């Protein structure tokens, strides 16, 4: 193993001028281009601020990139470009980077629309660095409520919390670390699992009014959902 590693290092040193030249060419080619990718989850029981954290993230992205990106949500975010109504929209080609915000994803995965969820979509989700890029955000009450195939594609997991109804914070974990944290019953061992980064903010009235969760609830009520037997069958197929 040591000899193979030495060989890799020697080849790297010999090829370094070419690598630097090509890397600089990539930087020049992509200068000023917005490219977003990754799948990130926001988790927390009702009232802990998971949808608020996701909305704050969207506000920050819109403030940073303006109209250079598209935003698509299923919970009537006021600054969205499109309404997210079916997974088929993820397979379309977009002329700008797309940020998808998927609130209460476990409910969507149990809808009849998801019954025809194709393997092609999983392939698409793993290739989100291609083209203009797709970044997918989602919320769920618990990590294990989310479809296991979708969990395996996640880049990061935000564990959300809110104090006094106004101060909201979230710690982002590596998915493998977060899975261990969720499965760990001993508090001292849970404390040893460290977050990669964090975010915190005050829930202003403006932020609270940037989406309409009640309208989303009405939309959810109009959907047809699979039975437990159908869900189990779908999971076996995937």
Where do the language-model regions lie?
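Hydrophobic positions on the alpha1 helix immediately C-terminal to the Walker A/P-loop
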Residues: 53
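Pre-Walker A adenine-sensing motif
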Residues: 19-33
């Amino acid at each position: 193993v040591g000899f193979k590693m030495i060989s890799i290092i020697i080849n790297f040193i010999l090829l370094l001028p070419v690598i630097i030249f090509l890397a600089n060419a990539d930087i020049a080619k992509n200068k000023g281009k917005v490219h977003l990718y990754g799948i990130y989850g926001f988790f927390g029981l009702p009232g802990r601020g998971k949808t608020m954290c996701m909305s704050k993230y969207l506000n920050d992205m819109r403030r940073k990139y303006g109209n250079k990106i598209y935003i698509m949500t299923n919970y009537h975010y006021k600054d969205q470009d499109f309404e997210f109504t079916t997974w088929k929209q993820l397979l379309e080609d977009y002329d700008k980077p797309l940020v998808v915000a998927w609130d209460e994803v476990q409910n969507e995965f149990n809808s009849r629309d998801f019954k025809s969820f194709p393997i092609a979509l999983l392939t698409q989700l793993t290739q989100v660095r291609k083209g203009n890029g797709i970044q997918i955000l989602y919320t769920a009450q618990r990590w294990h409520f989310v479809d296991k195939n979708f969990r395996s594609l996640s880049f990061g997991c935000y564990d959300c919390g809110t104090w006094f109804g106004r101060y909201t914070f979230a710690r982002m974990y590596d998915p493998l670390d977060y899975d261990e944290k969720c499965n760990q019953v001993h508090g001292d061992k849970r404390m040893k699992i460290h977050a990669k980064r964090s975010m915190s903010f005050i829930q202003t009235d403006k932020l609270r009014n940037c989406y309409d969760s009640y309208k989303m609830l009405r939309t959810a009520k109009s959907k047809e959902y699979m039975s437990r037997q159908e869900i189990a069958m779908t999971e076996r197929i995937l």
